[in-house]
């Protein structure tokens, strides 16, 4: 490798942007083919290629940052800005769902019976499973902070314990949400109430699964001695993401479950 007189990371040529783009093409065209011709072949191929691309691309980033030392302070600064902008884009993504919900609920049309929840909809009790879910996510926010402080203090064993607990709480939340969907007295086809409820809470549930996976990778890396008290941005990004998921749930709980019922 040629000597460089700057702290920035000159990335080696990589096939992953190309395979990622092909996966995106297969996913979008595969979805259209699935809707119109009921064939899952393209969609399945796209999913497999996307998962392989994600695994290998992130594996390469771990190699570059952890083993080759390319993630210097200026590079880490860029990664931080990237994560902040990504979370900001997610905030606006959820803002769209809240907008749809409040647009429908603050001025219910005559078709809904002029009231909210619409006539004929039996809502979920916000003080049963949704309240338990809130407690579970808030507890996971505490355990992920405990993990962060343990990493910074070099407490390896405590970090592993706290991360394991956070992941278990994340999976417990997903299980409870799945049970709630199964027992719900309305479906996604029940007008604007059903669609806003299931799309908003469903996308949040998807983010919990993504966050749990992100933290599980961090746990694996922590077990393999990848993180030090100074160098652990992978974990920090996962913790930011988890706190974001936490805050979105609080807004969902107050808006859709409590006020909306």
From Swiss-Prot:
It is an enzyme of class 7 (translocase). GO terms for cellular component: mitochondrial inner membrane; respiratory chain complex IV. Gene3D superfamilies: 1.10.287.70, Cytochrome c oxidase, subunit III, four-helix bundle (1.20.120.80). SUPFAM superfamilies: Cytochrome c oxidase subunit III-like. It is found in: Mitochondrion inner membrane. GO terms for molecular function: cytochrome-c oxidase activity. Residues 1-15, 67-72, 153-155, 224-232 are mitochondrial matrix. Residues 35-40, 106-128, 184-190, 257-261 are mitochondrial intermembrane. Its EC number is 7.1.1.9. Keywords: Membrane, Mitochondrion, Mitochondrion inner membrane, Translocase, Transmembrane, Transmembrane helix. The chain crosses the membrane at residues 16-34, 41-66, 73-105, 129-152, 156-183, 191-223, 233-256. GO terms for biological process: mitochondrial electron transport, cytochrome c to oxygen. PROSITE patterns: COX3. Component of the cytochrome c oxidase, the last enzyme in the mitochondrial electron transport chain which drives oxidative phosphorylation. The respiratory chain contains 3 multisubunit complexes succinate dehydrogenase (complex II, CII), ubiquinol-cytochrome c oxidoreductase (cytochrome b-c1 complex, complex III, CIII) and cytochrome c oxidase (complex IV, CIV), that cooperate to transfer electrons derived from NADH and succinate to molecular oxygen, creating an electrochemical gradient over the inner membrane that drives transmembrane transport and the ATP synthase. Belongs to the cytochrome c oxidase subunit 3 family. This is Cytochrome c oxidase subunit 3. It comes from Oncorhynchus clarkii. The lineage of its organism: Eukaryota, Metazoa, Chordata, Craniata, Vertebrata. The gene is mt-co3.
């Amino acid at each position: 490798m040629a000597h460089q007189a700057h702290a920035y990371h000159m990335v080696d040529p990589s096939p992953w942007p190309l395979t990622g783009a092909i996966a995106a093409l297969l996913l979008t065209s595969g979805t259209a083919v699935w809707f119109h011709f009921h064939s899952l072949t393209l969609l399945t191929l796209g999913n497999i290629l996307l998962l392989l691309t994600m695994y290998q691309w992130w594996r390469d980033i771990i190699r570059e940052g952890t083993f080759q030392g390319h993630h210097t302070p200026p590079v880490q600064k860029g990664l931080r800005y990237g994560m902040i902008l990504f979370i900001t884009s997610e905030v606006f993504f959820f803002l769209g769902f809240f907008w749809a919900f409040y647009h429908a609920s603050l001025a219910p049309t005559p078709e809904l019976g002029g009231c909210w929840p619409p006539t004929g909809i039996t809502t979920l009790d916000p003080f049963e499973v949704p309240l338990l879910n809130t407690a579970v996510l808030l507890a996971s926010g505490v355990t992920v902070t405990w993990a962060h402080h343990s990493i910074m203090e070099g407490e390896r064993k405590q970090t592993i314990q706290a991360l394991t607990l956070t992941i278990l709480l994340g999976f417990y939340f997903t299980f409870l949400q799945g049970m709630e969907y199964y027992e719900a007295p309305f479906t996604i086809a029940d007008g604007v109430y059903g669609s806003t409820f299931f799309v908003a809470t469903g996308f949040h549930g998807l983010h919990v699964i993504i966050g749990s996976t992100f933290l599980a990778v961090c746990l694996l890396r922590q077990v393999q001695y990848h993180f030090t008290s100074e160098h652990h941005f992978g974990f920090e990004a996962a913790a930011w993401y988890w706190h974001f998921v936490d805050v979105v749930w609080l807004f969902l709980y107050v808006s859709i479950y409590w006020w909306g019922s």
